[in-house]
C-alpha cells in the first residue's frame, strides 16, 4: 500500500476515534444540526476504518508468519499463511481504494428524471412510457418516493415528455448513468407486416437543488406565462388558467407544469425543475473540459450519446458504453436494474482509479 494512502487511512482512524468520543458525551444532542453532521460523518468513516483494521490485521498475520520461516518444521505452514495474508491484503487494498475515491457531491441528492420521445413518433412516445414505468418500478423496489412534476401525454398512449421527481437515499448515485439516448427495436402494435421498427428517447437525470436559493435565479430573468391546462384523449380540461410556463431568458430553458389544479403549486414545481435544469447545465459545462480530457465513457451524461439499445424480439438489452449485453429484458423493463447499475458503477470506479493512477 502506498504511504500516502496509509497516512490518509491513519488520519481517518484517528478522526473516527474523535467522533466516538464526541458522540458519547451527554450533551451531544443539544445542537441537533451538529449531531446530525457528526452521525453522518461517523456512518461514512466507520466502514472505511473497519476495512483498514482488517488490512492491518492481515499485515500483522504476514509478519508473524515471516518469523516462523526459520523453523523448518513450520516452513510449509508459514508460507501458506504468508500467501493467504498477502491475498487478503491485496483484496482489501482494492476495496479501500474504491472507498477513498472522491465522492460526487450530488450522489445523495433527490433527482428529477426527464424522458423525451425522440425519433419514431407514436412508438417513441409509447417507449417513453415504458421507460418511465421501468424507473418507477425501480424506485418502488428502493422504497423511494415519486412525484409527477410535468407530463405531456401522447394521443396513442405514452408521453411526448414527462418529468418525475424521485426522492430517496442515494437516488442520484444510482440513476445518474441513465442520462443519454435510449434506442428501442421492436414490432409496434400498429405494425401489420411484423416489421421491426427502431425509435429512440432521451433521458436526463438531474440532481435536485437543495433549495431554489442554491441556484441563483434573478426574477427579472424569468418570463412566467399562465394558460389553460390541456389533456389528451378527452381528459379533464381546466376552466381556469392554472397551467404555468416559466422561461429562463438567459439560457432559454422552458419548463411547463399543468398537472395540479392549483396555479401556485404548478409554479412552485416549475421553479424546482428550472433550478435543477440550470444546476445540471452549469455542472455539465463545468465538467465538459475535464470529461474531454479524460474521455470518460460512463460519466459524461451526454444527452446526444446513444447509451443503450433495448431489442424486444431478442429479449436483450445492450449498454454500449461498457459493452454489456443482458438477455433478461422483461425483468429489466420491470425495474430490475441492480445488475446493470452495479456494472456501470464498477466501470466508473475503475475509470476513476485509472485517472488517479495517471495523476500519480
From Swiss-Prot:
It comes from the Bacteria. Keywords: Cytoplasm, Methylation, Protein biosynthesis. InterPro entries: PCRF (IPR005139), Pep_chain_release_fac_I (IPR000352), Pep_chain_release_fac_I_sf (IPR045853), Prokaryotic/Mito_RF (IPR050057), RF-1 (IPR004373). The keyword Cytoplasm applies. The modification N5-methylglutamine is found at residue 235. GO terms for molecular function: translation release factor activity, codon specific. GO terms for cellular component: cytoplasm. It is found in: Cytoplasm. Pfam families: PCRF, RF-1. Methylated by PrmC. Methylation increases the termination efficiency of RF1. HAMAP family: Rel_fac_1 (MF_00093). Peptide chain release factor 1 directs the termination of translation in response to the peptide chain termination codons UAG and UAA. Belongs to the prokaryotic/mitochondrial release factor family. PANTHER family: LD18447P. This is Peptide chain release factor 1. It comes from Burkholderia multivorans (strain ATCC 17616 / 249).
Amino acid at each position: 500500500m502506498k504511504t500516502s494512502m496509509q497516512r490518509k487511512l491513519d488520519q481517518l482512524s484517528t478522526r473516527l476515534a474523535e467522533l466516538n468520543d464526541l458522540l458519547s458525551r451527554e450533551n451531544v444532542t443539544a445542537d441537533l444540526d451538529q449531531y446530525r453532521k457528526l452521525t453522518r460523518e461517523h456512518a461514512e468513516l466507520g466502514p472505511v476504518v473497519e476495512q483498514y483494521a482488517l488490512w492491518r490485521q492481515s499485515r500483522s498475520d504476514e509478519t508473524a508468519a515471516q518469523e516462523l520461516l526459520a523453523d523448518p518444521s513450520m516452513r510449509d505452514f508459514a508460507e501458506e499463511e504468508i500467501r493467504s495474508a498477502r491475498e487478503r491484503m491485496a483484496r482489501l487494498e482494492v476495496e479501500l481504494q474504491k472507498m477513498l475515491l472522491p465522492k460526487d457531491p450530488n450522489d445523495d441528492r433527490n433527482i428529477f428524471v426527464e424522458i423525451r420521445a425522440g425519433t419514431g413518433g407514436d412508438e417513441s412516445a409509447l417507449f417513453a412510457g415504458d421507460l418511465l414505468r421501468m424507473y418507477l418500478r425501480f424506485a418502488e423496489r428502493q422504497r423511494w418516493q415519486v412525484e409527477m412534476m410535468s407530463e405531456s401525454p401522447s394521443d396513442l398512449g405514452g408521453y411526448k415528455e414527462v418529468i418525475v421527481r424521485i426522492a430517496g437515499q442515494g437516488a442520484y448515485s444510482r440513476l445518474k448513468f441513465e442520462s443519454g439516448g435510449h434506442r428501442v427495436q421492436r414490432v409496434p402494435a400498429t405494425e401489420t407486416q411484423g416489421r421491426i421498427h427502431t425509435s429512440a428517447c432521451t433521458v436526463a437525470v438531474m440532481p435536485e437543488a437543495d433549495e431554489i436559493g442554491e441556484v441563483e435565479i434573478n426574477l427579472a430573468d424569468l418570463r412566467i406565462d399562465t394558460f389553460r391546462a390541456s389533456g389528451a384523449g378527452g381528459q379533464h380540461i381546466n376552466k381556469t388558467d392554472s397551467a404555468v410556463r416559466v422561461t429562463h431568458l438567459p439560457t432559454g430553458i422552458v419548463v411547463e407544469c399543468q398537472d395540479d389544479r392549483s396555479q401556485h403549486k404548478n409554479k412552485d414545481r416549475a421553479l424546482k425543475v428550472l433550478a435543477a435544469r440550470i444546476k445540471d447545465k452549469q455542472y455539465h459545462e463545468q465538467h465538459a473540459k475535464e470529461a474531454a480530457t479524460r474521455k470518460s465513457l460512463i460519466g459524461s451524461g451526454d444527452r446526444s450519446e446513444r447509451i443503450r439499445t433495448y431489442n424486444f424480439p431478442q429479449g436483450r438489452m445492450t449498454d454500449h458504453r461498457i459493452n454489456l449485453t443482458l438477455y433478461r429484458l422483461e425483468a429489466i423493463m420491470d425495474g430490475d436494474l441492480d445488475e446493470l447499475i452495479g456494472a456501470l458503477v464498477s466501470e466508473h470506479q475503475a475509470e476513476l482509479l485509472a485517472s488517479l493512477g495517471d495523476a500519480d
